[in-house]
Structure formats: C-alpha cells, structure tokens
Amino acid sequence: MESEARVSELGRQGDPIRSPAKRDPARKDRILAAAADLVARHGYHAVGMADIGAAAGIVGSGIYRHFDSKAALLSALLEQLMDEMERSAAAVVAQADDDRDALERLVTTHVRFAIEDRRLLQVYYREAHHLPEEALRGLRRAQRHYIEEWVIALAPLRRELSDAELRVVVHAALGTTQAVLFHHSGLPADRLAELLEDMGRRCLGLPERAPTE
C-alpha cells in the first residue's frame, strides 16, 4: 500500500503543469477592429458582444477573455485611439523646426487620422457618451492634452488671441475634419486630404502654402 501510494504521489508530481492560456494580441486587435466597424455602422446599442465576436472570428464566449463587457470594449477602443493621437501629436511637434511647422504637421497628422481611421473617429464622436463615468473622464482628459499641443504651438503665432480664443480656434480647426466622417464625398484620398488640410490651416490663420510645381 505504501509503495502504491508513493507511485501515485510520483505520478501526480510528474503530471505536466499547465500554464494559464495566453491572450493572443492579434485576436484582441481583431475584436477592436470589428467593434469599430460594427458600432460605427449600426450604433452602440444595436451591436452585441456576440455580433462583434462573430465578425472577429471568435467562437462563443471567447471575446470575454479579452473584454468583460461591451462598455469595457468601447473604453479600450477609444483609449487606443486617443493614445495613438497623443503619441503622434507629441512626435510631430518634437520633429518640428518651429511653431508654424508644428501646426502644419499637426494638421496633416489629424487629417490622416480622419481619413484612415474614419470608423474609429465616428465611434468617438457618436458613442463616447456611453462610456462609464470614470472612463469618460479619462477620455476627456486625454482630449484636453491633445488640444493643448495645438494651443501651445498656435499661441506664439496668434498673440492677439486670449487663451480662451486660442482654444476656440483649435476646436474649429479640428472640427473641419468632421465632415469627412459623416459625408462620403467620393473624392480620391489625396485630394480630400488637400482640401481638409487647407480648411484646417485657414481656421488656424496660417499663411497659404506656396503652390507645388
């Protein structure tokens, strides 16, 4: 009996130790991309977790291994957007030669986001109010940081404006890109970007660019 017990104990000790299943980052990205597309097209309330999982190729409840609720998914989606926008803004400002160059780069980068990440920005403008209060506060805080990059660059160029006026001008410049989010112009992306950048620059009061040959 003692020998059998020892063999049994050794058998248990020899059993392979299973590590917890790892989350696949690519799968999480697929979920976020599917959520952005579905929520942008149908609205937050009309889309369920099962719909998002199916669109991402996730079977059954696998989506809950990454997000415990639809609100958590929306929060992650918009947090990812603002993180990327903040990083890009900081990077282009750091590369700029002067304040005017910084604003030029900010306009170009923001227009690129509006065209390339149209679905994400649609969700941001239409559905952010569905976030839990704490997540919404964090999103608004990130938005203020993003706008601050623009205000800091604009202030030396528009010294006649007060701080409040500078922020109005920046919001107006950012608002020029919203038309592309909800209106399909049919224009080629390059031409659309050119128009949007021109409108943004005009809002900021930047001089016209010299025509390219």
Segment roles from a protein language model:
Residues E4-R6, L10, S162-H183, R191-C203:
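Hydrophobic alpha-helical segments that form the core
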Residues A36-V39, M85-E86, L103-V107, A114, ...:
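Short, structured motif recognition centered on aromatic/hydrophobic residues
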Residues A76, A90-E116:
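Hydrophobic alpha-helical connector segments
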Residues A114-E134, F182:
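Amphipathic alpha-helical segments used for helix-helix packing
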Residues E133-R158, R167-V168, E194:
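Amphipathic alpha-helical packing segments from all-alpha helical-bundle domains
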